Structure formats: structure tokens, C-alpha cells
UniProtKB/Swiss-Prot annotation:
One Pfam match: Ribosomal_L4
Alphabetical keyword list: Ribonucleoprotein, Ribosomal protein, RNA-binding, rRNA-binding
Full protein name: Large ribosomal subunit protein uL4
One term of GO molecular function: rRNA binding
Organism: Thermosipho africanus (strain TCF52B)
Lineage: Bacteria, Thermotogati, Thermotogota, Thermotogae, Thermotogales
Gene Ontology CC: ribonucleoprotein complex; ribosome
Single Gene Ontology BP annotation: translation
Annotated region (Disordered), positions in chain: 48-77
Quaternary structure (record): Part of the 50S ribosomal subunit.
Domain of life of the organism encoding this protein: Bacteria
Length: 221
């Protein structure tokens, strides 16, 4: 089994922890990672961009001047695309952006992203982070103790309880830091709500609590 150091919130190394090879130590499949991120970003698009064609712009129903004998170029409508205030040629219209992946590829993409972070040495496991009340200063102190100050950090918490929600709120005002809760595994048992490939790759460091590791291994192992 893969091993990684386990830290406490003071930044002290309290010993190694075993990680399942089938989740954290596979050979990253970059093709599947790309497909998953492409699906995420595509499905996040609103698809509401809209422009008017020359037939939809108000006005322009008559010919602006006669065809011949004016010395000017012939024109058919003041709402043609090359006119100021004219319609848009080949512009966007509202549409649905949607892509999907099968369960096997979703699981592989997530395990590949986790394995990549471990392979790079950018995965940190912490025994526990809990706050009685939201306080940005406290989370800054924890990240500083872990040597993660002024870095892009993704912190993944195991479940939605008050002490963890307070940690999530505490991270809102720290630039580059995102805190998510990996709660309620999906009904197809192939993913963890909140934990996704794009966020893992979009942050330089991945911080998992010991409870988060257990949940990930339970779902993906």
C-alpha cells in the first residue's frame, strides 16, 4: 500500500498512513482526465448567449435606395450584417451544452487525479480540522503550519456537520483556497459530491482529512 505522512493541524508529522493502491497509486490516465474535465466545463455552460439575425432586428423592411443610378453600392436592407445596427451573421443562439461519461470512466478519472497529486507529492493528509465557529484567522494558521501559505489549496472535508461547515465558511475569504465537503456519495456509488477532478487539478495542493481518505477509499476502492 502507498504510504503518506499524517500531519496534525499544528503541522507536526504524527506518523505514516496507508493509502489503497487501487485508489491513490494507479497510473494516471490523462486521456480520461481530460474527458472528465471537458465534461465538467461543458456542463457548466449556461448556453444562454443569443443574437438577432437580420430577420429578427427591427426595421429594414424596405430597400434603402433604388438599385441603380445613385453612384452608391447596391443595398437591400439597412439591417444586413455589414450595416451598423444590423443583424448578426452566424451568431450564437440558446442551446443546451451537455456531455456525459460512463461510471467506469468517472471513477478512473477521479482515481487518476488523486494518484497524480500523490505522485507529485502534492497530497497532504491531516488527522483533523474542526472549528467551533467560523474564523478565517484559524484556517490561515492551520495552512501556515502545514506550509501552505499563499498557495492554491483544495481542502476536502468528510461530512456535513457543524464543525466542518465552520471550516468551509472560514475558507471563503482566503485567496486561492477552496474548501469542499465530500458528503453523500452518489447513488451510483461512482463519485463523491463536492470532490471533482477539475478542482483537484485546478489547485496546487490537495489537503484531505483522515476521515475524507476513508470515505474516498470506501466509495472508489
Amino acid at each position: 500500500m502507498a504510504k503518506v505522512s499524517l500531519f496534525n493541524s499544528k503541522g507536526e508529522n504524527i506518523g505514516p498512513i496507508d493509502l489503497k493502491d487501487e485508489v491513490f497509486a494507479i497510473e494516471p490516465n490523462f486521456d480520461v482526465i481530460w474527458r472528465y474535465v471537458d465534461m465538467q466545463l461543458t456542463n457548466a455552460r449556461a448556453g444562454t448567449a443569443s443574437t438577432k439575425t437580420r430577420g429578427e432586428v427591427s426595421g429594414g423592411g424596405r430597400k434603402p435606395w433604388i438599385q441603380k443610378h445613385t453612384g452608391r453600392a447596391r443595398q437591400g436592407s439597412i439591417r444586413a450584417p455589414h450595416w451598423r445596427h444590423g443583424g448578426v451573421a452566424h451568431g450564437p443562439k440558446p442551446r443546451v451544452y451537455f456531455k456525459r461519461l460512463n461510471k467506469k470512466m468517472k471513477r478512473l478519472a477521479l482515481k487518476s487525479a488523486l494518484s497524480l497529486r500523490l505522485k507529485e507529492g502534492n497530497l497532504i493528509v491531516v488527522d483533523e480540522i474542526k472549528f467551533k465557529r467560523p474564523k478565517t484567522k484559524d484556517l490561515r494558521e492551520v495552512l501556515k503550519n502545514l506550509g501552505l501559505e499563499n498557495q492554491k489549496v483544495l481542502v476536502v472535508l468528510p461530512k456535513k456537520v457543524e464543525e466542518y461547515v465552520n471550516v468551509k465558511i472560514s475558507g471563503r475569504n482566503i485567496p486561492g483556497v477552496k474548501v469542499i465537503i465530500a458528503d453523500n456519495p452518489g447513488v451510483d456509488r461512482t463519485n463523491i459530491d463536492g470532490l471533482n477532478v477539475y478542482d483537484i487539478l485546478n489547485h496546487d495542493k490537495l489537503v484531505l482529512l483522515q476521515g475524507t481518505v476513508q470515505k474516498i477509499e470506501e466509495v472508489l476502492g
